[in-house]
Regions:
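Amphipathic alpha-helical assembly/interaction segments
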Residues: 1-118
């Protein structure tokens, strides 16, 4: 069952990264903010993928925790860009929602992995 959740999480994070790249494609004049958003959003899936091939359970947990931190950072950049009116709420609300879904899945996965560690 955990393997199915991990695969779903990997798939969701890949789709999420693609959606963020598409969302930011047309933004002009805010290179540094767009770069930060794209880096954190794509890092989520990269760390989830790395976790699948962790050397140990603690390494697995560490990779998921990094993905979780990147998820929180991505939410920050999305919210900032909304407040600064670089992204409209309408354009980014689904992306922000999806980020929250991934965040909650990561929290649950880390919790389960820590419980299984004991």
């Amino acid at each position: 069952m955990i393997a199915l959740a991990e695969n779903k999480l990997a798939d969701l994070s890949m789709d999420f990264a693609v959606n963020v790249l598409k969302l930011t494609d047309g933004i002009k004049g805010h290179y540094s903010l767009v770069n930060q958003l794209e880096r954190s959003a794509t890092s989520i899936g990269a760390n989830i993928r790395e976790a699948k091939y962790a050397h140990s359970r603690p390494d697995f947990i560490s990779k998921l925790q990094i993905a979780l931190k990147e998820c929180y950072e991505t939410e920050y950049w999305l919210e900032l860009m909304q407040k600064a009116e670089i992204l409209s709420v309408e354009m980014s609300k689904d992306t922000l929602h999806d980020c929250g879904v991934i965040r909650r899945m990561l929290i649950a996965s880390v919790k389960t992995a820590k419980e299984n560690l004991a």
